[in-house]
Amino acid sequence: MHRILIVDDEPLIGQGLNSLLASSGIGIEAIYVAHNGYEALDYIRMEDIDLLITDIQMGAMSGIELMHQAKLVRPWIQTIVISAHETFQYAQLAMRLGAKDYLIKPLDGVQLLDSVRNALLKLEKRSKSREETIDTLRDSFRVEEPSALQTALLNNLLSEDVNSMKPSAAELHKLGIGLGGPYFAVLKLRLLPRSAIASNNPPSERDAQLLRYAALNITAELLAETERKSVVFYSGADELSIVIQWDEESYENTSVSKLDQLDMIGRSLHRSMKRYLGLTTIVSISQIANGLQSLVLLNKQAMQALQWSERHPDHDVFYYGDFHESLYTKEETSEDELHAQHNRIAEGAKAYIDRNYAQKGLTLHEVAQNNHVSPNYLSYLFKKTNGMNLWEYVMKLRMEESRRLLLETDMRRYEIAERVGYESPEHFSKIFKKYYGISPSELKK
């Protein structure tokens, strides 16, 4: 059963799509309707939305911006875009952000339902037990390992060994390996199969090989969907290396943060390995640098970030730039020093939210940027330090202030909604009732 969010600033279209989906017979648990991007983001943060159906041209926040913000919250969310404009530029932007379809208004009901079914198909796969996963792999896969020569050359390219001869981009190209760059980042994916498997029943060598091969293929498939040029290869018994690259044009395109792109890839990889293979993983992400020769440094960064999982066993995706090297490279660094650093970051974020919680369009990216860490790491530290996630804290402040204004002032509902950061009084009332169990008007009585 799936949860679908419809976003359109024309209420009649939203209602019509809601009715169409509700009577379709598709396995839908809940349908939500939002009238602008801000309302939609509240639903995405509060509910486990599987599919987003959004208009591309709306008021304060476009469908393109909504897609980007939605991916930051839930990188795996499926999206269908609807538009009154048959414009290639809009369609291209939507597809780059992972839209599964781009439909032109007036909508054809049959076409929309077909698109919804197709988008939900990928979500139908459930997490399998280890035994089911291995049985499926035995039946379905004829393992064709990647070329040993290609794997050796790629690992050599990342190696710190000064005596090794690094292959050139031209030499790699002859072998079918495209690494033109010129901008690169390195990700490491460490598979922890034994953490998901009872210690008294370890996998056979053959089964471990099957899982590793499946992980390589899932990684390649996921990266192909992101339209990022990449190379994936083995770099150890339980480890994959991923080289992400940007050409000059895509790197200079600032419409989407490169760090956000890498973070979304990392989180999607972690989730996919758990969902489809039942494997626990750790993902590390380097910074971005120019030139093929930078891969040695970037690989070193990714390796270092991977080691930081020992300090944070309850975290999964590590970005090198999040960690103060002066703290993490000292063997004598105490837990108190690390705890103090984490508190400073979390408290800085909390202070920023205290000042800006009523701002319409406040984003996790904005709060993270203000505190000089990635959104993923800030989310982790904030919840660990404060016992609630960042958006729960934003909502707490908004609801407490709106309750105070209702009880202590004569302000109207639309004025209070505006004051605490909501686009419409109707949406504010829904959130308020969900939070307190009564509507603003009932509290006012």
Language model: regions and residue ranges:
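Alpha-helical/coil-rich non-catalytic "connector" segments in signaling and regulatory proteins
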Residues: 1-152, 180, 226-235, 268-272, ...
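Hydrophobic alpha-helical membrane-association signature
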Residues: 13, 211, 215, 265, ...
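Generic solvent-exposed, charged/amphipathic alpha-helical segments
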Residues: 18, 216-220, 266-274, 303
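Interdomain helical linkers/hinges and coiled-coil/dimerization scaffolds
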Residues: 108-264, 319-336
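Catalytic-core segments of nucleotide cyclases and related cyclic-nucleotide turnover enzymes
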Residues: 111, 259, 263-266, 270, ...
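Flexible, glycine/charge-rich interdomain/linker segments that couple
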Residues: 135, 279-292, 308-340
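Glycine- and acidic
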Residues: 201-202, 284-287, 364-365
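A short glycine-enriched loop-to-beta-strand structural element that forms part of the catalytic core
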Residues: 231-243, 272-303, 316-321
